[in-house]
Swiss-Prot record:
SUPFAM superfamilies: Ribosomal L27 protein-like. The lineage of its organism: Bacteria, Bacillati, Mycoplasmatota, Mollicutes, Acholeplasmatales. The N-terminus is cleaved by ribosomal processing cysteine protease Prp. GO terms for biological process: translation. This is Large ribosomal subunit protein bL27.
Length: 93
């Protein structure tokens, strides 16, 4: 006579649910703060970035965290540098 057994396997560990999930960092609000053709005041932030996605052109400074800012008041102009590089410049009005 053969016996038929049904075995139910249970999880040896709890499902890694609510205690291990639920963390996320706040967004860093990167990107363009002023567009092409807009007027910038001296010291205003033009572009926030991580690394040099866009390079500084005329009258534009590069901050310690690679933020681009206007050195003088003027009009913003996004331009192409040699190759595939992009730069942003500020021209006086």
């Amino acid at each position: 006579m053969l016996l038929k057994l049904q075995i139910q396997l249970f999880a040896s560990k709890k499902g890694a649910g609510s205690t291990r999930n639920g963390r996320d960092s706040h967004s860093k609000r990167l990107g363009a703060k002023l567009s092409d053709g807009q007027i910038a005041k001296a010291g205003s932030i033009i572009y926030r970035q991580r690394g040099t996605k866009i390079y500084p052109g005329f009258n534009v400074g590069l901050g310690g965290d690679d933020t681009l800012f206007a050195k003088i008041s003027g009009i913003i102009k996004y331009e192409s540098k040699r190759g595939n590089r992009k730069k942003v410049s500020v021209y006086p009005q």
